Amino acid sequence: MKKRPIVLCILDGYGLTSRVEGNAVKLANTPNLDDLMSIYPTTVINASGEPVGLPDGQMGNSEVGHMNIGAGRVVYQSLTLINKAVKEGTFVKNEKFLSAIDHVKENNSKLHIWGLLSNGGVHSSNEHIYALLRLAKEQGLEKVYVHAFLDGRDVAPDSGVDFIKDLSAQMDKIGVGEIASISGRYYAMDRDKRFDRVALAYDVMTQKKGETFTVPVQYIRDSYANKVYDEFVIPGSNRNTDGTIEDNDAIIFANFRPDRAIQMATIMTNPDFYSDKGYVPEVRRNNIQFVCMMKYADSVKGDIAFSAMKLDNTFGDYISAKGLKQLRIAETEKYAHVTFFFDGGIDKEIEGAKRDLINSPKVATYDLQPEMSAYEVKDKLIEELDKDEFDVVIVNFANCDMVGHTGIIPAAIKAVSVVDECVGEVYEKVSSLGGTMLITADHGNAERLLDEEGNPFTAHTTNVVPLILTNTHLALKDGGKLGDLAPTMLDLLGLPIPNEMDGESLILNNETCLV
């Protein structure tokens, strides 16, 4: 019997809003999605805030989105858990933080705080950095240095100067801390093994090699004057501090999201790990007490301050146990999301699951190649579907998010159009096989590229995302959330929803098993 696959198609960063100005989703030519929305059951679902386990009003992101989708439940996120610890006072009693502080005291050394200095809430929170400074002060430390990674992606591209001002004000108020270095996240938080980027930030922190400054705010302003904004600010060290990382120091990495923290943390704690990829750091620091906010990866050798919500019986595990075959496919930028994050933040092999990784193009920024590798993802997916092997497919098209982050509207418009073209071809193939597509997104981005004043807006949004079900015999409920997608797929597969999932099927009138 031929397979009739269920294909979950995630259009990363494809949100919905009525505003047209700066809205690449509305400005792009999208005949395929327009037709699908007019023909098939369509609704909108929540992808931000409390429905996905974030604080109220907090924009969603790819990690959060895919974890909620794969778990089939509301997944309370790292940001929420750590905020709760700060509020309830358990943050300052955290054993891993206190162990790092004891290490500093015993060695008469320095405490370094790494982190994305931003209130974006995607990778970090500046409030957590301030909480660490307060803890250091309470514990009597004097040599405390912040290595600030500038955002400009999940927040306004030129907001870094204000975050640095606020950090300086907090240091003055608390009575401890100096800014030791500044780096755009493009360098310090690379995740694609572009070691030339990472090395610039690492060498600044460990050797004061490269650019230097004496006034942090002026360093950023000078960068702005050269049209280089937060994300891309060249790493530089403060000549007026003794903030170089040395033997016997301690480091607390305040980022809670793993994917863009792994490389830098691995290089510091496990310096030979990337030797087979052609990179080892120029200098190694010994006897470093290293603390991650959350678990990053096994390659990172250090303590973990907080444990993530344990997710049993995720969608992938559940359908595997039922004997179904599944395919996960995405290009590099979103591969971790359809595997690691979709599986509950665990990198694991699942029986009956195949993974296809399509390399993302090697360009500086994706506005230079808005199509990214979407056509290759689409072609490989169609090739896989022709094999008649898979009951379920999870595919991610990265373009709307990754190009949306550049803030370049014409490029984002092209990105949306390319995704539409690919969705159209995938739909034709799935339809020819008698299968069903669920087309949705993990969060918004490309639909808002200008703020209210007409300035570039490069962050994610709190807007709803679409859900299209390509079956005219069914209807969809309104008011859903990302955590309802796994139960919805199980409903389509004719499988019961496991107790671990608190999401609900969004199908109103399903009486037949489709697979």
Stretch-by-stretch model annotation:
Residues M1-V515:
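Feature captures the catalytic ectodomains and active-site-proximal regions of enzymes
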